[in-house]
Amino acid sequence: MLGLFKRAPKLEAVFRPTVAVARELTREVEVAGELVLRNLGRAAELTDLELVLIGGGTRRIDLVVPEAWRGRLRLGAGGELTAAVAWKLTLAAPMRAPAAEIQVNTTAGGRHQPLATTPAFPLANE
């Protein structure tokens, strides 16, 4: 009964890209940098995280979650998780987008629930 009234944690996601390129002709996307997830509320327990790259506001591409972020994570009030990430993905269709953002979701409880989204960062097109 108490689980019905459980609030989603107040999280903030920040991505500092070192590489962010969409290669339209080869159907590739390469994104690398530092991803930070901050807890702005009280202590929270995070499980079943997933990351999604949103290109141009509509294109959604699943990303591999950093190894340290898998499983059950305890994030104290004011705490943060930091990971150096690098993804190079081959797409089924070409993508041209001026900007992208990374969305952090959870699938705990059988539903996709967005937890935080990074501010948009420029995505170079080659």
Give the predicted meaning of each segment.
Residues 27-34, 82-84, 99-101:
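Short, solvent-exposed loop/turn segments enriched in Ser/Thr/Gly
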